[in-house]
Amino acid sequence: LAHYSERYTDVINWYDEFAARTTSNSVLQPLTLALKAGALFRTGQQKEAAYLFSKVFAASTAKRISNYLGFNWSVDRKATKNDYLDKCKDDKERAAMLALFALSSSDNSLPDMKEIFRLNPASEELEVLVVREINKLEEKYFTPAMLKVPGGKPFYFTWEDESKDSVMRESEKEVKELSSFLDNVGQSKKVSNPGLFENAAAYAAYMTRDYTTAKKYLADAEKMPLTQKVKDQWALTNLLVTINEKDKIDAAFEEQLLPSLQWIAEKVKAEKAVTLNYWQVQQWRSIYRNLMSEILAKRYHEQGDLAKEALCIGNADHMMKGQQNYYGSVNGIDFLRNNLMSKDVEKLYSLLTTNQPSKFESYLFAYNSVTKKEVVDFAGTSYVREYDFAKAIDWFKKSADKKAIVKNPFIDVLYDVEEQLADEKKFSTTKLAFAQEMLKLEQQAKLPATAAKSFYKMALGMYNITYYGHTWEMVQYYRSGSDGYYVPENGTGFQKEYYGAFKAKEYFEKAMDAGTDKNFKARCLFMMAKCAQKQVHQPQYSEYKTNWDKYDEDQKAYWAKFKANTYFPQFVKEYGNTAFYKEAFSSCSYLRDFVKKK
């Protein structure tokens, strides 16, 4: 009562007079000592307060979070650790206080852990610090290292700063040093849970891809007494090492792997969710997801097997289905649509329809967001992306998805328009109908009498299924409003077409060459200019890290090049007296600006 009445001097005096003499093991002793620590803090005696809070934290689990916070509040970060450690009476107290410093640090705590082990090998906080240090290095080193490995689907979004490579190099040294230290502790016979340290040493070695050392540490850990949690961690670490050290994931290895996946799936079923900050957390569920979408999927990607890579990501989706903290419930389907070419889709379909799937394959098929229905529909779409309309028609005829597209894919407008137009309210077509019309136009383009108009209509169809086109839905399932005017680095053939309109430009040129009417040829050339404008690379924020001055400079240069279309000089010179030129001049501000500057 005196403490909460702000009678801090009374609290200190009464503790020293009465409570300090108490010799019982009652929880009241550490509770009252914490009150004295708080009173010391309130009266400006921070170092003494920090010392008492660390004593109370080590002595009892009662109000431990409160005592941890009290210690943190009492520490002046401008002072050195030794200013506080000097208050401790013995090595055990110094180890306990050092542990509290380490618990609040986001920096490398290995030096502190080494000192704690030297001072008091039996420190119970050391086990917590081991797990925490592993978690920190997973964030600083392992996560960015995994992002450098192509394939799979990382969970949520990631962000990296320009210093990540130097941070990673430094962190890799920390991981290796930590692994060696943990092995020494595990082998020391001075700790009560040596298996935890030895297994953690193995996991740290795994993070740096030192699988030989990881296997040695795992073999040592297996001989030690292990708690059930450490046994589970041993099994997971061993599984990770086994998957990654394998030269190739083949059918025999898949059969060997299946029981481990089923074991984790059973763990998920048995695990009770823990509420943490309003979220329902299930660690085993997250472990399963990460194993499939970030570990096994990447191994298949490394082998060029995008079909099984997609199925691994889809299997992870299925495990996370319905989870309130899992937004990406169709990652497998997104991967299918954004990464597989038609040859990969054919392989995936053959896999899904095989008469004699292995047990591993049957398991993947049974629990997956990627289904045969999705694959069939996308197979047709993938062939449209590659302009193979005959094969697209075959696949669309197999598909149960007959979704209507309510915009005209052959609309001929001089400006880019994504939304449905007023005169299209009753319009309806399908992907199948589009592919059939394009195939018919292909044949008509071979005849001199119909070549020019057929090439032109095909070019319209090709342009309208780009990012800028009227019916992008023919080839995509989602359209961001902030893409365009650049082709993604390492983009697929489809992405280059979708953002660059190269094939459309080629066919407008074919139409112009085949045509004889000057007004028609003017229209073809203007549409070529439209396509060429999309091929001027717009600077992207991601290309400049933090060099915004260079970004601004390149952005200005981009706009100058964007406006000075490479085809405008020819268009003005050769077709300036046509009726279409007047129409284009009235419609296109870039053309007007170009003419005015001449």
Model-derived regions: residue spans:
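Extracytoplasmic/secretory-pathway proteins
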Residues: L1-K598
